[in-house]
Amino acid sequence: MGTLGFVLGTAAMDHQQVLIDQLVDQVKNTPADDTFYYLVPNHIKFETEINVLAGLRDRQGLSGSDRFASSRVQVLSFSRLAWYLLRDTPAFQKQHLSKIGMAMLTSQVVQEQASDLRLYASEVKQPGFIQKMTAQLEELKNANITADDLTDIIYRVKSANDPAANQAWLAKMYDVETIYHAYEARLRDRYIGNSELYRQLVSYLQKSPEVAKMHFFIDRFAQFTANEQQVVDALITNAASTTISLTLDRGYPDQNHPNPQELPPKNNLFYSSAMQFHRLWKFGQMHQKEVKVLQNVAFATTPRVDAELQQVDSYFKRYASEPIGPGEREELLDPQNIQFMTTTNRMTELNNVATQIRQLVASGKYRYRDFLILSRHLDGYQTMIEPVFAAHNIPVFNDHERLMDNHPLVTLLTTLLELPQRGYRTADIIQLLKTWLLVPRTGTGDLMGLSDFQAAVFTTENWCLKQAIEGKNAWTTNDPEKIKQLWQAPGTNLTDPKYEQSRLEKLNDQLALVKDFVANHLLPVFDQFKQAQTGQELATALYQFLAAMGVTDRLYAWQQYQSTRDLDLARQPQQVWTTFCQILQEYVEILGQQELRDGTNEVLADFSELLQAGFAAAQYSQIPATLDQVVVSETGIVQSENRKVVFMIGSTDDVMPEMQESDSLLTDQDKDILSAYLDEDFQYLPGTAIDQLIDEPFVHYTGFMNAKEQLIFSAPQSDSDDKELSISPYMHDMARYFGQPVREYPLATSKAGQDNAIDFVSAPLATINRLVEVSRQIRDEQGVGIDRQPVMPVGWQTVAESLVKLAKQWQQSADAKVQAEGISLGQRLSLVAAGFHYQNKIDSLGNKLAQALYLRAAPDDERGRVLYASISQLQDFYINQYEYFLKYGLRLQKRDELTLSNDRIGTFFHKAMETFVTTIRENNLSFADLAHKDNQMQRDQLIDHALVTAQENQPTLLRLINSSAQAQFQYQQLTAIVKTMLITLCRQAEYTGSQPVKTEVQFGRIGNQQPGNLGSLDYPLKDNHHIYLRGRIDRIDNLKQGNNNFLTVVDYKSSNHLFDLTSAYYGLSLQLLTYLNGLQANLTELETNNPRLAGALYLRLNNPTIKAAELKKSSLDDLKLKEHQYKGILLNDPQLLRELDKSLDKQAFLYPLKEYKNGKIKANKEALLVTPQQLDWLQNMNKELVINAGNQILSGDLKLNPYRLLTGSNRRTGLDYSDFLDVFQFDNMLDQQNYRDLNPNLAKEAFDNVVQDDDEEDKK
């Protein structure tokens, strides 16, 4: 008969000491062939083994330096116990299915059962569904609920007409039951999972005679799963002795509390442990033939923690069970050992913790392994932990799980297998190459140099975007003409002697390298995939492809590279490859002999899903790189008990305590219904959110009590998104009870931080970071410019001097490593010092270099050299002078992509409009006549002709349209807009006397084209230079009135544009006025009698959306007309305006004007009516802007001076749409003085002054 004993005590007591004492006693007093097993959670197995063996050694009188081992004692987890006892049994020889294999098996089952599912049929393809379903199935197995049990429960629920179980619940349970039955059928007799493993262990414990000689000590388990509970029950009834340690202040019952009916209330801190104890005690009483329950419970009475932690232990036990009055106080023996603080944010919090750890270790009283940092959840800190602790030069081990699903090998596999289904998109092929795991081989068979291949891939990526290369055929073509068209740079002449060693040759070689690699080495693998008949053949083809392509060589190279830098990163390639091999092995085991269905794309998609499911379940193994390091973990994870100091970070009220939300497929309500039909002694599901909330105090309590000497609470005041956070009630109430302040840890830049530099001294790098922050703050406070030094606080001045001194000491060290660190520190200090004097200023080019850069010779002109410029270039100059230099001096360009960009759309629009207007004029047709229904067929033919001509004008457009469905849709929208606009043009002619007379009128030379229809705008500059301004007017309309011909300029826009006086005044919008000046300078060339300028207008090209409610007021055609009004500048001549829009007396269709009953015509904000004098003033202003820009450009004195215009709540700057922000390095905090602030009122005042001057002139 075996025995069942308990060791109880709070977390402040040393349970392990009692267990080891009992272990030593039993080892001495039992036969030599008896064996002993010390069972703990897997997370702490290694450290517990060290502690237990050390305890055994000490009790045998051996010193710490003596070697010690004990073959009779094993420290194991439950899973390792199963392996240890079953490793030679037939059951254990079955294929062991890992989490990855389970996920793959679930994925396969779900795919097969998808058509039979009621609720989940639409979710089977959703990301994460397979993981959730796998977890749910395993949860049911761990709860000892079989598929047959589930079927029986569903039947009983239906029979009982349980009102809680509605149709949705039944549908969900039907789906789970369907999948579960298929899942169990696949597992049965072939595989062994964790649940089956535990069942086999229970069977072994019940049948093997060897178990009667085994003694078990179970420690540090707060609760057992149903499977673990079965194992414990089997140990109790079959082993020689079982001793269980629980964190519990008393037994239910025990020698001091004999009433077996007495149970604690749910608000008792140890409620879960008490219920666990009572269940085990009750089980022992029910099996008195097999086991004797020891009468007296052993209590751990030796404190494991210091006195202050014992005070916390007593306080929290009471705090969880009953309210403590706000006036109650208890004084800590040493307040330094229990601290409470808040910080500004999580980053400041981590830096504070790291600084304290660094300083405590520097005191010589602590090692890094003495510190444990805990948080309820580490998600908010995950990206900060490594860089912060690296800056403080603190070794850290983050045991938070890390998934493999973002590793380049995973990206390679998923992208490769999805290529056919996604149509061999170029973006996917480039992504595949950018994993850098697939590299071409040289003629010798070696992998080519990675840097050369990377350069070729980047070049090819840009080229493919520029040429809109898409699809398998584009990559695999052998047609010389297609290769020349798609894969050779324009101007390539292989027979030209100058071609060799040229940039063209290098470009073509890079393109050929990547194209050939993809066509001849990557894509052929899909032919091998097509030939695969079974799952095993498919897996073999994939493995052989990766091996042949040198993927293993690349992974090994990565491992070798990181082995001397970061051991954690160095282990990842091997772990990922091992995981991949395991996935393939389990895939072959599960699906290897299954014949693949027809349809390679679908087969590969399914295969990819299985691989992704496998990798999504895989994690990197967490192996500490060194024993002496700080551990970062989460509460709820069992920790070893040898940490002296615990930092509880993130102590905020949203997670301490936390109301957890279940993300499993079965909700808490689902589980509540299910639990009502379970055998509570044999089957039980994990606790619901309410159960977990009851356990929250205990979870945090065990976290607090990991500390032996100090417990430090820390809480950020705000989250990463600046959301305000409040401190935890646990932290607040404990601080109040012990009369301790919740100290706000100051920023280094605050007054307190400036006065106490010592609080921020850590490793050199982290200290420098704080020193920089303080120095900047002091400079701002003292108003110190870059040419002066601020007066630093004494403490920080000492810190700065100490860092310089330290750098010099290290540089003089005989140790080469220390010397290198000294040089690095010195360089960083020099860089920091220089940074305070850095200005984001642009050096002047000087006029000679500027003139050499910008000036060109003018043909047949001896007046000097000429600055050729376009309107958009000068607008860029006024937006930001430095951007002009980058674009037109250095000729920097953003990556060219063959897309339906604004430029290409504009070209298409203009060509279509030009063709339409020109054809009508050449055939002496009337725009107004074409608006009539009788001429609709002729008009449609003209529109089709215009569209064809516009498309032929851009040969690459057809290739772009055929490259993707998105481009096809965009083109359809584009042609619809053009059709709408051409019809609108005809309808507008019915309401105006103005007619288009010219389109696409070019003045000056554009690029390499022939000189335009009209001459350049030629303005003289300083030093006998000239600026030739070029442009293209979209349309010129003519209104004949008496002997005069009034000309208006029309500029097409794809978005809504208004003439903005302020933008025109400051040079931000030069187009309309420059067009007028260009037209005026060439009036004699127009062959028009008595030409006069009537205005300049924008016309928006769009297909407007008309609200249904508006159709009640006007017809659709009229509403469309009003949506296409001309907006801009017009002469304020009533007779002219009435001719321009003959509908003014009713409702203006063509212009944003309104004629009142008194005959006056006024414009709304979308048009500006001007007098001839005002128009002259605007044109002269425009001319001066052009001349000033030209002189400034040639002076070479260009500035980084983006404009800034504030109008009400609107803010516009010259940086809003720039492609060169990374080049500018413009800092909105430090470079405010570089903005060129514009006065929004100045232009209006100047414009109004023209009116006043005219009035005064009239009076004279």
UniProtKB/Swiss-Prot annotation:
Keywords: ATP-binding, DNA damage, DNA repair, DNA-binding, Exonuclease, Helicase, Hydrolase, Nuclease, Nucleotide-binding. It comes from the Bacteria. Disulfide bonds: none annotated. Its EC number is 3.1.-.-. The keyword Mitochondrion does not apply. GO terms for molecular function: 5'-3' exonuclease activity; ATP binding; double-stranded DNA binding; helicase activity; hydrolase activity, acting on acid anhydrides. It holds the Pfam family ADDB_N. Its cofactor is Mg(2+). GO terms for biological process: double-strand break repair via homologous recombination. InterPro entries: ADDB_N (IPR049035), DNA_helicase_suRexB (IPR014141), P-loop_NTPase (IPR027417), PDDEXK-like_dom_sf (IPR011604), PDDEXK_AddAB-type (IPR038726). It is an enzyme of class 3 (hydrolase). The heterodimer acts as both an ATP-dependent DNA helicase and an ATP-dependent, dual-direction single-stranded exonuclease. Recognizes the chi site generating a DNA molecule suitable for the initiation of homologous recombination. This subunit has 5' -> 3' nuclease activity but not helicase activity. Belongs to the helicase family. AddB/RexB type 2 subfamily. Despite having helicase-like domains, this subunit does not have helicase activity. Heterodimer of AddA and RexB. This is ATP-dependent helicase/deoxyribonuclease subunit B.
